[in-house]
């Protein structure tokens, strides 16, 4: 029988205090049957992305413990960072990897949301495949106004009523929980400190503004450099190299260039192979030509 593997990639609103990050990771790692694969902290975004995998019961319990720990240690009234956010645990996506379906992940998201709402008294919004409201499928729509805006609206605006939990915000804010396919978090840095250029480029490449399908983008300023921060929601249909080349063309319009890029968290191997194939212009290439693919079979 195929082992069930589900990935969870929660984003926590803390990227500067190592003690807090370590405590959240420890809470997740303490669950039997869960393996933490990656921890990526960003001080400018003031955000940490943790990637872990496990079976359905273990992954659900680990996510709950991570959310509970974050709620104890992160005060959203004091939080500052470049990245949009709603709560101490901002977003918790579940991703089917092996022996699991999207429906399995939707069920986990709903169970976890109900528990977080009742036991931790944190408002929960379901998004992507788990959304109960079509208007909440897109994370950016759910997160609009961020923590500060939601705090003003949640009690009085019916459209901002959570799926689970109270219609009020405590210091842990709100949490968005859902199910989705694999996503690539990808950032590109420009040789300028003009954030308006990054914002214009982000507007050009993101789908919601008429750009590339399956691309979400923001223009930010990180460590004095303009950054185009992106989520690539379907790398099979909009590959990394297509995004890079479009940003290069857009940057040239403003007299700037791409100086570096970064991946946040883990990335599917095929996405990187597709990028290598494009830039190396390889003909007739197959995964059988990769040394490590044979070693993995042993």
Where are these regions (language model features)?
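Long, contiguous binding/interaction regions
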Residues: 2-298
